[in-house]
């Protein structure tokens, strides 16, 4: 891994870990109210667009956990998902030249979150295909 890539990965990991430790139940509730904003962020072109399907699955998993439909999820997974999605929703840099760098950082945070929670996401997807579908 090149030095700039390693630095970005380390920064993204630090950011995700820091934010995950601070997630509260109120943060989960606030995130679940911002579905439309997430659709905009992941629906546009750019580094986040490639995560659109995973973002929808991650959001649905958190929503189903929160509503009690899918209670098997560890809090650490919920916190990590809320932290990553919340990071994507945080305001971009006010300096236009840094906006692209912000998006790349957001993509790195999402990639780390998805990687860290791949087992939980796969299990949730299996649960969905067994016929228990979220509303």
Describe each model-derived feature in a short phrase.
Residues 75-110:
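Membrane-inserting effector segments that mediate pore formation, membrane fusion
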Residues 1-79, 112-135:
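Terminal, membrane-proximal amphipathic helices
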């Amino acid at each position: 891994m090149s030095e700039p890539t390693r630095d970005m990965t380390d920064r993204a990991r630090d950011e995700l870990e820091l934010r995950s430790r601070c997630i509260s139940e109120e943060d989960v509730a606030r995130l679940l109210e911002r579905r439309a904003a997430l659709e905009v962020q992941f629906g546009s072109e750019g580094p986040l667009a490639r995560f659109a399907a995973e973002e929808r699955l991650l959001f649905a998993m958190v929503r189903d956990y929160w509503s009690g439909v899918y209670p098997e999820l560890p809090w650490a997974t919920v916190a990590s998902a809320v932290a990553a999605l919340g990071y994507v929703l945080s305001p971009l840099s006010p300096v236009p030249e840094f906006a692209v760098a912000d998006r790349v950082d957001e993509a790195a945070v999402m990639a780390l979150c998805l990687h860290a929670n791949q087992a939980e996401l796969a299990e949730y997807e299996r649960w969905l295909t067994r016929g228990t579908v979220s509303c």
